[in-house]
């Protein structure tokens, strides 16, 4: 009996420790969301972000309509969920990339993320959903970048749980109003909408147990690059840390490294 209790006790201790570590950041985020519900503060923050933007064509500044409430029970629940996923993720820079299961749109065939990695080519993994305004605002920039670097890298879009479901933390700025996925068919249907906005891109969906989202701490959206089974680029959590410009910079430096060394290609860049 004591032997059985050991793993459960360890798990409980880890959960409690995580809550203690995450609570200050969560409370700070909650305070920021509450302040952003004051229109004068929100407009000032968004204006400052727009003025400081240096790669607007790739990473357009965050846009939040006045009608959107920022501090609600649903928003706080979503923030806590995202912060917990980030804390418990198994993907880390320089470590082995989790080879989680995903579902292909064609034939609903189950496969694994690293199945899309070809030899020594980098695999760019882009996690997101149609109800995430920053993700959708950058989708065309991602598509252009993929087309420009298709000769040196592979690209994969992974559709995860909705960032702003219509029955949760609703965003009127979202391109689509989609409720939380109740079954795999719901997720596949939502992914088809993403594919329409990014024709030519390879799109798969996370399983309904959200294994890829959990392993990569991908919620709300996130970028990764995997090279020979290792995580060589880990983007920040969206929306603030989700930057196509960083992805472009990594790929350009990697390409320059290939041209300079004629082959080794082991480029690990942390940005």
Curated annotation (Swiss-Prot):
It is found in: Cell membrane; Endosome membrane. The chain crosses the membrane at residues 16-36. InterPro entries: Iodothyronine_deiodinase (IPR000643), Iodothyronine_deiodinase_AS (IPR008261), Iodothyronine_deiodinase_I/III (IPR027252), Thioredoxin-like_sf (IPR036249). GO terms for biological process: hormone biosynthetic process; thyroid hormone catabolic process; thyroid hormone metabolic process. It catalyses: 3,3',5'-triiodo-L-thyronine + iodide + A + H(+) = L-thyroxine + AH2; 3,3'-diiodo-L-thyronine + iodide + A + H(+) = 3,3',5-triiodo-L-thyronine + AH2; 3-iodo-L-thyronine + iodide + A + H(+) = 3,5-diiodo-L-thyronine + AH2; L-thyronine + iodide + A + H(+) = 3-iodo-L-thyronine + AH2. One of its GO terms (molecular function) is thyroxine 5-deiodinase activity. Its main location: membrane. Belongs to the iodothyronine deiodinase family. This is Thyroxine 5-deiodinase. It comes from Xenopus laevis.
């Amino acid at each position: 009996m004591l032997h059985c209790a050991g793993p459960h006790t360890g798990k409980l201790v880890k959960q409690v420790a995580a809550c203690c570590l995450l609570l200050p950041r969560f409370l700070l985020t909650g305070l920021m969301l509450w302040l952003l519900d004051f229109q004068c503060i929100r407009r000032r923050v968004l204006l400052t972000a727009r003025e400081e933007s240096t790669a607007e064509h790739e990473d357009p500044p965050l846009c939040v309509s006045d009608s959107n409430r920022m501090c609600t029970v649903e928003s706080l629940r979503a923030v806590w969920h995202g912060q917990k996923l980030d804390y418990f993720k198994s993907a880390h820079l320089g470590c082995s990339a989790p080879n989680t299961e995903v579902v292909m749109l064609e034939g609903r065939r189950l496969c694994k993320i690293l199945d899309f990695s070809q030899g020594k080519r980098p695999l760019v993994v882009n996690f997101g959903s149609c109800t995430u305004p920053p993700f959708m605002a950058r989708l065309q920039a991602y598509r252009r970048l993929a087309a420009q670097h298709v000769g040196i890298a592979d690209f994969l879009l992974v559709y995860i749980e909705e960032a702003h479901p219509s029955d949760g933390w609703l965003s009127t700025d979202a391109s689509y109003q989609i409720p939380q996925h109740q079954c795999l068919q719901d997720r596949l249907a939502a992914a088809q909408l993403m594919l329409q906005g990014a024709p030519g891109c390879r799109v798969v969906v996370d399983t309904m147990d959200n294994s890829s989202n959990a392993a990569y701490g991908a919620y709300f959206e996130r970028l990764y690059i995997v090279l020979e089974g290792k995580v060589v680029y880990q983007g920040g959590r969206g929306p603030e840390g989700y930057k196509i410009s960083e992805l472009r910079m990594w790929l350009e430096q990697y390409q320059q490294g290939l041209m300079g060394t004629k082959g080794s290609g082991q480029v690990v860049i942390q940005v």
